[in-house]
């Protein structure tokens, strides 16, 4: 079964068709989870050998122009898949349950608007998981001490990210130093846009420490 078949199954179950694949995450068993950004909040699951693709999870959207999840990642400590954006800042799915359902994560702090969320990553920090998502011009970090029933947040901002197509955060290690870069797509400067450089923007790594 290909993704078209999964989209057909979501449509059969819900009457709505997800599209716009944005990011994938892998669990410890090698299964992949693909998030859809458009049509509806939905996640497809693909087996390690790629032979089995299933309509794994979905929920109602919030009526926005981009109702689906914008990013997805895996936290090995809680054995949960975390989706970013869409109907809420953060949504958890427990892989310890046979039929995981979307579980809203309560945010302790001011997340701000949902518009503009992009990808999210898991960064290991001092034996724990910190999630960092992109929402121009901010990088927003999350940490939880209760298995993602709730999460605290921190933000850092760079004005260069406001109009550069800020889509993702990546972590780096330089000796003992752990840091973050913002990655931009520069949508206005595509293959024929004349841009000759594609910079990374260093972010304040203080958002990794709670």
Predicted regions and their residues:
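Beta-rich, blade/repeat-based domains predominating
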Residues: 5-32, 60-84, 110-130, 161-177
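Active-site/pore-lining binding-face segments in mid-to-C-terminal subdomains
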Residues: 96-98, 102-157
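Surface loops at the rim/top face of extracytoplasmic beta-rich domains
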Residues: 33-58, 71, 83-84, 91
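Structural motif
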Residues: 40-44, 89-94, 137-144, 190-202
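Short loop/turn segments immediately following the C-termini of beta-strands
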Residues: 29, 37-39, 77, 81, ...
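Beta-propeller fold detector
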Residues: 1-8, 53-60, 101-109, 150-160
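Blade-level signature of beta-propeller repeat domains, shared across WD40, Kelch, NHL, RCC1
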Residues: 168-210
């Amino acid at each position: 079964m290909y993704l078209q078949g999964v989209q057909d199954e979501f449509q059969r179950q819900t009457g709505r068709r997800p599209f716009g694949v944005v990011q994938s995450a892998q669990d410890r068993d090698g299964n992949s989870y693909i998030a859809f950004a458009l049509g509806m909040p939905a996640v497809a699951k693909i087996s390690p050998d790629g032979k089995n693709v299933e309509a794994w999870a979905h929920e109602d959207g919030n009526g926005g122009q981009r109702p689906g999840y914008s990013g997805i990642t895996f936290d090995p400590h809680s054995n949960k898949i975390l989706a970013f954006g869409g109907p809420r800042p953060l949504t958890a799915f427990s892989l310890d349950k046979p039929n995981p359902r979307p579980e809203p994560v309560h945010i302790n702090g001011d997340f701000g608007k949902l518009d503009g969320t992009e990808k999210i990553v898991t960064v290991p920090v001092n034996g724990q998981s910190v999630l960092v998502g992109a929402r121009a011009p901010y990088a927003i970090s999350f940490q939880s001490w209760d298995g993602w029933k709730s999460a605290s947040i921190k933000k850092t901002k760079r004005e260069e990210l406001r109009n550069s197509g800020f889509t993702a955060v990546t972590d780096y290690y330089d000796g003992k130093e752990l840091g973050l870069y913002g990655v931009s797509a520069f949508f206005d400067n595509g293959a024929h846009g004349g841009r000759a450089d594609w910079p990374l923007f260093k972010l304040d790594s203080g958002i990794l420490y709670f």
